[in-house]
UniProtKB/Swiss-Prot annotation:
Residues 1-93, 126-173, 352-421, 956-1087, 1092-1111, 1130-1171 are annotated as: Disordered. The capsid protein forms a homotrimer, from which the VLPs are assembled. The protease is a homodimer, whose active site consists of two apposed aspartic acid residues. It comes from the Eukaryota. Residues 660-835 form the Integrase catalytic domain. Residues 1-16, 153-165, 402-418, 960-969 have a biased composition (Low complexity). The C-terminal RNA-binding region of CA is sufficient for all its nucleocapsid-like chaperone activities. The keyword Electron transport does not apply. It comes from Saccharomyces cerevisiae (strain ATCC 204508 / S288c). Residues 583-640 are annotated as: Integrase-type zinc finger-like. Mg(2+) 1 binds at D671, D736. This is Transposon Ty1-ML2 Gag-Pol polyprotein. Residues 1610-1752 form the RNase H Ty1/copia-type domain. A motif (Bipartite nuclear localization signal) lies at residues 1178-1212. Residues 1038-1053 have a biased composition (Basic and acidic residues).
Amino acid sequence: MESQQLSQHSHISHGSACASVTSKEVHTNQDPLDVSASKTEECEKASTKANSQQTTTPASSAVPENPHHASPQPASVPPPQNGPYPQQCMMTQNQANPSGWSFYGHPSMIPYTPYQMSPMYFPPGPQSQFPQYPSSVGTPLSTPSPESGNTFTDSSSADSDMTSTKKYVRPPPMLTSPNDFPNWVKTYIKFLQNSNLGGIIPTVNGKPVRQITDDELTFLYNTFQIFAPSQFLPTWVKDILSVDYTDIMKILSKSIEKMQSDTQEANDIVTLANLQYNGSTPADAFETKVTNIIDRLNNNGIHINNKVACQLIMRGLSGEYKFLRYTRHRHLNMTVAELFLDIHAIYEEQQGSRNSKPNYRRNLSDEKNDSRSYTNTTKPKVIARNPQKTNNSKSKTARAHNVSTSNNSPSTDNDSISKSTTEPIQLNNKHDLHLGQELTESTVNHTNHSDDELPGHLLLDSGASRTLIRSAHHIHSASSNPDINVVDAQKRNIPINAIGDLQFHFQDNTKTSIKVLHTPNIAYDLLSLNELAAVDITACFTKNVLERSDGTVLAPIVKYGDFYWVSKKYLLPSNISVPTINNVHTSESTRKYPYPFIHRMLAHANAQTIRYSLKNNTITYFNESDVDRSSAIDYQCPDCLIGKSTKHRHIKGSRLKYQNSYEPFQYLHTDIFGPVHNLPKSAPSYFISFTDETTKFRWVYPLHDRREDSILDVFTTILAFIKNQFQASVLVIQMDRGSEYTNRTLHKFLEKNGITPCYTTTADSRAHGVAERLNRTLLDDCRTQLQCSGLPNHLWFSAIEFSTIVRNSLASPKSKKSARQHAGLAGLDISTLLPFGQPVIVNDHNPNSKIHPRGIPGYALHPSRNSYGYIIYLPSLKKTVDTTNYVILQGKESRLDQFNYDALTFDEDLNRLTASYQSFIASNEIQQSDDLNIESDHDFQSDIELHPEQPRNVLSKAVSPTDSTPPSTHTEDSKRVSKTNIRAPREVDPNISESNILPSKKRSSTPQISNIESTGSGGMHKLNVPLLAPMSQSNTHESSHASKSKDFRHSDSYSENETNHTNVPISSTGGTNNKTVPQISDQETEKRIIHRSPSIDASPPENNSSHNIVPIKTPTTVSEQNTEESIIADLPLPDLPPESPTEFPDPFKELPPINSHQTNSSLGGIGDSNAYTTINSKKRSLEDNETEIKVSRDTWNTKNMRSLEPPRSKKRIHLIAAVKAVKSIKPIRTTLRYDEAITYNKDIKEKEKYIEAYHKEVNQLLKMKTWDTDEYYDRKEIDPKRVINSMFIFNKKRDGTHKARFVARGDIQHPDTYDSGMQSNTVHHYALMTSLSLALDNNYYITQLDISSAYLYADIKEELYIRPPPHLGMNDKLIRLKKSLYGLKQSGANWYETIKSYLIKQCGMEEVRGWSCVFKNSQVTICLFVDDMILFSKDLNANKKIITTLKKQYDTKIINLGESDNEIQYDILGLEIKYQRGKYMKLGMENSLTEKIPKLNVPLNPKGRKLSAPGQPGLYIDQDELEIDEDEYKEKVHEMQKLIGLASYVGYKFRFDLLYYINTLAQHILFPSRQVLDMTYELIQFMWDTRDKQLIWHKNKPTEPDNKLVAISDASYGNQPYYKSQIGNIYLLNGKVIGGKSTKASLTCTSTTEAEIHAISESVPLLNNLSYLIQELNKKPIIKGLLTDSRSTISIIKSTNEEKFRNRFFGTKAMRLRDEVSGNNLYVYYIETKKNIADVMTKPLPIKTFKLLTNKWIH
C-alpha cells in the first residue's frame, strides 16, 4: 500500500541514491576500471528490483538528538544518531518540516546504510548507478534555469528527461589525509556537477545559482560525511562543522575561495619569475609592483626569501640596470631593499644626466659597487664594534652593498620615527645633481645584521681621522686635492675625488661645518668623531645623542646593528652639479675604467688577450684608451690564482745537476707499487723499487704490506748492500709523500744514518719521474711475461725480479752503457739465463716411495739471489724451489704433456704452452749433481699459499678421500710437444696447502681451522686447533688435509689441556752442551738452581718469604726486597699456608691420569697410549702410518675390497669440507630486512616503531646530504663496479629503542672502489681497560658521549653510486654518494681520519703513538670507538670544554656526564660499569647476558643445579667420524657460531677466567659433534649461573708513588697436537686485572722450560706497549714486573752464559728476555704454582683450584 502511494506521489520521492543499490559488494582489491558487461547488467537488474521493493520506515523509528552537540540543530535536517554521523546513515525529520518533505504530514525516512554509501559498493565506471534518482521521480535532480522558480521538473516530461539525462556517475575518492583535502574538494565538486547538482555549487562571489532543496541537502550531507571521514578533515573544516555539522555549503564556498587564492598565487609566481625592467618606467612603480607580489605571497604562506627575490629581480634587469647582475651576484646577504636602492640611484642619475655620456653612470656604478678596493681585490677586513662602547674602528673601505631596514626596531626617545617617505630635492638648475629621495626618519627599524647599512644616515666612527662621504649632494665648496692620501684599515689606498665642507643644521638651530672627502669607493658614509670633537661636538652613547660640551643636545644617535648612526637630515644640501664633481679630480686615470674591473668583466682573461682584443676592436663600446692600464703590469687577480692554479713546470734536463754532483749510489730514487689484489696471503702484494741516479742500477724487494717495520727492513737491507758491495754511502733518497715514507720511524732511521730525505711536492708525480717510470716499465714487463708464459698471477713478483735482472744488463740509449757497467759489474752471462716460464724437469732426491717418479715438471722463473741455482715453480706441489737440479725441456722428445698436475684444478692442457726458447745447457751437462739441496731457506716465495678467492663449495658434493694422492698418468697417447714453450696453467688448486715444500716430508694430517676470530683484548685473534684434553690422532687422515698449519704458527691461537710429561730425552738449554739428559720437573730444577745460583743463594730463604720469589735483578734505586714486595703487594693472589722449603707443590697432582686407550681423534695430542715416547719417534710413527695409508689408497678398489675399507669413511667429508670452505658459512644475522620489519611484520606496535625509526633515518640522511639530490643517473650510463647496492636494516637495541639504518652492501664492493691500505681503527680493549684503571686510581671524572650518524660526517673521495632501496620505486635510477655511508669498506677509515683531524686541530688533542683512537692533552684523555667517546679528566670542566668544541661540528649527545659523587652506572662498549669515584669500579655484563642467553635456545639448568666451574679436567673430545647429513651439519655449525661468538665476546671483555674453555671449544666450531655441543652448553650454562659476577677493582693506595704493571705467565708443556704447548698471560695494573690471553705456542717446545720461555716472551711486547701507554696517560714512574712459576726459566734469563742454546728459536727468545731485564728495567720473580692465577689460562682445573685462583679478582 505504501509503495503504491510512493509511486503515485513520485514527484516528491527521494532519489535512488539509496534505493537503487544491489546486494553484491565489490571487493576492495578489484580493479576499479575493470567492469565487465555482465556486471553492468547485474547492476541494472538489481537496481530495478531495489526500486520496486523500496519502502518507508515508520515514524516511531525517529532517532533521538545527538548528545555531542549542545547547539540547536537546524530544523531542516535532523541531528545524527550516536555521534557526528548517523549510525545507519538515516535522515529523519521533526515536526518543523517544510512542505513537500513527507507524505500526508507524516515524517519520512530515507534508508541510507553504510555499505550502500561506501565507494566500494558502487562499481565506478560508465555503468555506475550512483547517484541516480528512481525512475518514478521523472527526472534526476536537474539544475533548473534561474528563471524557473520550481525546484523539480514537470512530471509530464519525466520520461523524456529521464532518458536524456540519465547517466552513471563515478563517486569521489575517499579522503585519506588533511593535506589532500584541496584536491579532494575539486573531485567532489566534479562529482556534484556530474550528478546534476552544479547549480547548488557556490560561485566566485560565494552564492549558488539556485536554492538547494532538502533532498539535495540530505544527499550533500551524507555523501560528504561518507567520503570525507572526520579524522582526515583539516582544522578549518572541523571548526565549521563544530558550529553546524550540516553546513556543507559553507565548506564548499570557502574551498572555492581558496582555489581562487591559489590561482592568484600561481599568477604572482609566474609574474615574479618573468620580471622585466629597463628604466622605461619609474623605479618607484617597479618597486611597488614587486613588493606587492612578494607581500601577497608571504601572506599566503609562500615565503620568498631575499636571495631568491634578488635573483629573480636581477635576472629581469636589462639596459643600464643589467650591470647590477655582475656587481651584486657575490653578496650572499643582500636584501630586496638594498637592490632597489641601487636601481633608484641609477634611475635618478639617468633622469638628472641625460645630456652627459650615456655610460657615465655605469662607470660610477662600477667604481661604487665593484672596485671598492681599487687595485687590490682582497676583501677588506670588517672590524666589529662593541654595541656598548664608542665606535673605535678605523676608516675602512666600504663593503660592496647598502643595507635596508626592516620593521622590528624600538624607537628612540629624542626623535620620532616615521615610516619611510620620499621627497625629491628641488635644485635650482637642470645641472643640479639628483641624489634620490631623502629619508626623513631619525630613528629606524633595524635587523640584527651587524654588516647592514642604515640608509639616510652617517656612521659614527671614532677610529676614522677624516670624514668620507660617497654622494656629492651634501659637499660644499668642493675643490680638487690630489695630494691627499687616505688608507683603510687594511692599509689600502682609497682614491679621493674631491675635498669640501660638510655643513650641519642641528635641532638648536646652530650650524657647524667640518671638512669632508668625497669618494665612491666606500660602503658607509663615515662621520669622524675626531673632526666633530674639533668643533666641540661629542657623542654620548649612554644617552644616544650628539651634544656640545655644555650639555646641549644637537641630534639623536641611532643604534642599528653593531654601529651607531646619525641622520643625514641634519646635513645641508649643496648645489654642486655633475660636471663639477667629475672635473674635481684632474687625473686622467680617474675617468678610465680600472683594469681589475675590465679583467673581471672579460671573464678573467689574461692581460695580453684583453689588450689584443681591444686593439683590434673585437670588443666594441670602448677602446684601449678607455682602460687604465697603469696597474695591469703588476696586477695579480686572487680569483685567477685560485681558479687557474697549476703545477709548476718541470724543466727538461733539470736532474743533470744531481748526476754531476753525486757519485754512484749516493742519490737514490724509491717508490712503492701496489697493492695487487686477489692474491694468496703468502704472495707479496707490493714491491718497493730503488734506482741509483748516476748508474741507473735498480733493485726491487717484495712487500706483503706497507707497515713501518716492513719498509724499515728494506731500507736497512739496501743500505747495507750498497755499503758492503759498492763501498759507497747513500747521501740522499728521493721519495714521495706517502705515509710509508713520512712516518717518524723511517725519518729517525734516515736521520740516524745521516741520509737526507728528499720528498716530492704533493700531487706532483712528474717530480718523481725516475721511480714512477721504472714501476711502469717493470709492470709492463710483468704483464707481458705472465701472458707469454701462462703462469698464474701469484708469481707476478718473479716476473718483476726477472725483468729487473735483464733491465740492469741492457744498455741505455743515452749513455750507451748498461747499469751494471756503470756500477763496475760484469755483463750478464746469458748462458745462465732461461726464458721466463721455461719448462724444466726438477730432480726429486727424496720421493714419497721408491716407485714414484724422480722428476717433477716445473717452470723456470729467474736466477737465485742467494745461490748459483735457479728459482723454479713446481705446479704439482704449488711452490717454488731454489735448485740447480733441473733439466731443460727441449725439442720434440718432451713428454711433459703426459703429467697430470691436478685434474681438479687445471683446465688447460699443457700442449697449449707457447713462447719459444733456446737451451743453454749442453747435452753432456744434463745430469746434475745430486748433492745440492733442492730447497733454499732464502727464497722469498718458498711457500705459496693458494688463491684465497672463489673457494670450491665442497659442502655441496662429496669429495673423495683420495683427492690429495699422487695423480696417475694419462692412459691415452698424448701429442708430442713442439719446440714452443709449454704454457703453464693459470689456476692453482685452492685446497692444497702452501706448506707442501719440496722435498715432500711425510706429515701428520690434522686438519687445521682458520679464520675463526674472537675479539680478544679488543682486537682479533685467530682460534686454532681445538681440544679440551685431546687424545691421539688417528693415523689415517690424508696428508693433503694438513692445509692450514702454517697459518696457525703465525697467529695467536688458543690451545688445550696440559699434561706433565717427564723422562723425555731432550737437549739441555742455557749454558750447557747439546746432550741428551732426562727431563726434570720444575721442582727438581728449583733445587738445582738453589744449589748452583749464587744470586738465589744470596736471596732470603723461601721459608722467610710468603711468596717464594726469586729476584733476577738488583735495582740501584730500590732494594730488591722492597721492589719485590711493591710488585706483589696489591696482586689478587690466593692466600695459601706457608710450606716447608724442601716440599715443592706439584701443580698437576690433582689432574686425573691420562687415558691409555687410543681414539679416532683427528687432532692428535696427549691421549696417546705411550705418553713417554720420544718426540722424534712419535713424529716418525705418524709419518710412517700416513705413508702406508697413501700407498694403500692409491690402489684401493671400493668394489672388490669393501670389507677392507680404510679407517676414514666418506662421512668424514663434512669436517674436511668445512675446513676447506670455511668462508662459505654465512655469518650470523641479527638484523631485520625491510620486508621483515615493516611489510610482513604482524606485530603492529613493533611495526609502528620500526616505521618511525625508518622515517627518522631518512630525515637524517637528507639532513646530512648523504647523496646528491640534484641529479639521478641511469644505471646503464654508470660503470657497474662503481655501483653499490643498498638496503635498510632494522634492529632493537639493548635499551629497547628501535633502530633503522640505511647501509651499503660493502660485502660485494669492487676492490677498485676503495683503498685497501686504509684502516678503520677503534680503541683497543687494553687501552680502554688501562684508562679505566688509571681513572679509578686518580679520581678522574668519566664522561660518555655519542655522535649521531658519525660516518655521514666524513666525505667520500671515490665516485660511487648506490641503488635506492627497492620499495622506493627507483629501480632503474642511481644516486651519487657524497658521504661515507655505513657499510662501505672505506667509511670507517674516512670517519677515523675526519674525527682524528678534528680532535687534533680543533680540540688540541694528540694521538698516543702505537695506540690508535687514544687521544690526550694535558688535562683530558679520550678513547674513541667509532661514534662512542669516553672522556677521562681530573677536572670536569675540561671535559665540558671538549664537549662544547665537538658540538660545534657534530651532533654530540651526552650519554653520561659523570658529575655525581655517588655510584654512577655506565654502559661502555658492552661493559656494564659501576663506578664510585675514589673508591671502586665493577665491570660486568649481567643485564646483557640475562637478555641474550635465553634467546640462544640452550637448555638452561637441565638438572636444576648451578655449575661451579666451566669444565673439569680429564675430559677428552672424541674425534670419531661425524655421521651427519649436510643440512644438519650446517645447522649445528650455525648454532656453534652463535654460542661461541657470545662466549668469546664476554670472555675477552672481562671474563678472563673462561678464555681457555672458550678458545678450546671455538676450535671445534666446524666439528659440531654431540660431545662438543654438550660441552658448549655446559659453558653457556656456567656463564648463565655466574652472569652476576663482576671484575672488581679497588682504588690503589694514595701513598703509592709508582704505577706497577705486572704480567703473570704460565705454560702447559706439550698438551696440544704436534706436542705444542698452551701458554697464558694475565696483565695487572696496580693490582687490577686489565686483560688476559690464552693461546697455543707457535713453536714446538721440547721441555717445560722452553714452554715457559715462550710464554714469557709472548707477554713482553704487550707489556712494553702498555708501559708506554701508561707513561703517556699518567706521568708517574712505572715499575714493570713479570712473574713465573718456572725457576729454570728465571735461571736462564738471569744467566750470563753466552754458549749456544739448543736451537736458534728459543735462544733468540731467551737472549731477548735478557736484554729486556738488563736494559728496560724489567723485574722477574718467582711465584708458586698454586698462586699463579695464569694457570686458569692453560688447562682445565678442579673446582676447588679454579675458585681459589679466581675468587679474589672476579666475584
